[in-house]
Amino acid sequence: MQQAQEPRPALTIKEIPAPDFPGAIPLDSVDPEPEQWMAMGRDRGVRNVVSAALIPFLPDPAKAASTAVIVAPGGGFRMLAIDNEGFKAAQWLADRGIAAFVLKYRLHSVPRDTDAFMAAMMSTPPGIPATALQDARAALRLVRSRAADWKIDPAKVGLLGFSAGAMVALELALGEDNSARPDFMASIYGPLSARPVPADAPPTFAVLAADDPFFAAGGFDLIARYREASRPVEFHFYEQGGHAFGMRKQGSTSDLWIDQFHAWVKSRGLLD
């Protein structure tokens, strides 16, 4: 008998002061008004991001591989779930020798009032802001340009995105602008509907749950496009997980996604 998942508690949002990240690297954007940080249950989020930054999580040099992963949180391009889909994943990777960098990319403007913001989050999500793509490309170029400083192989820089962040990752990996392709890519509960897969598409790891309320109904024809293009792809379709689970454990097999991603990276020789 299938075990039902426990219902998630209602989410409450409380404004909190912006934390200080001494090692954050600005990505050449201007901040005319302070971004807004929020406590969302046990995790933090941030909205109205207009000044992009890259926040490093570097491994212990004694166990560091030469691989880097840029982590792009989701949030519907109206906020970033920067703890559950950013810092926690980056720290997990750094603990296993992978240099990780959380990308705080620019978003669409949303109401500064909390109640109005919550109402706006219930509306149809906007499309990918051009600034988010600019920030992701800038992040890839920056990590490669400073690869020697961080003891990273500039040919082993991947991009891992959650939900909206996965849409950014997919666009960089598959879009017509190939000026800053990642060397490998992970789409964590991003859309997997069909789109062209170019001949230079990077190896891709993809995750989706059958009960994802946003993207499961769209299917995963993109995986077939990878196969038709003879490009490497690994796809995990979980029975349960929903959407936006990130690093949160739910007692389902989707809890294992990051272990499986790590195993995939290792199997491709990226941790040698």
Say what each PLM segment does.
Residues 206-208:
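Short beta-strand/loop motif that positions the catalytic acidic residue
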Residues 65-74:
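Short beta-strand element of the alpha/beta-hydrolase
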Residues 115-148, 257-260:
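Alpha/beta-hydrolase active-site loop
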Residues 83-101, 224:
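Short amphipathic alpha-helix adjacent to the substrate-entry channel of hydrolases
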Residues 227-272:
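C-terminal catalytic histidine-bearing segment of alpha/beta-hydrolase fold enzymes
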Residues 5-63:
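N-terminal cap/lid segment of alpha/beta-hydrolase-fold proteins
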Residues 131-201:
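Primarily recognizes the serine-hydrolase "nucleophile elbow" in alpha/beta-hydrolase
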Residues 76-77, 81-82, 104-131, 247-249:
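Cap/lid segment of the alpha/beta-hydrolase catalytic domain
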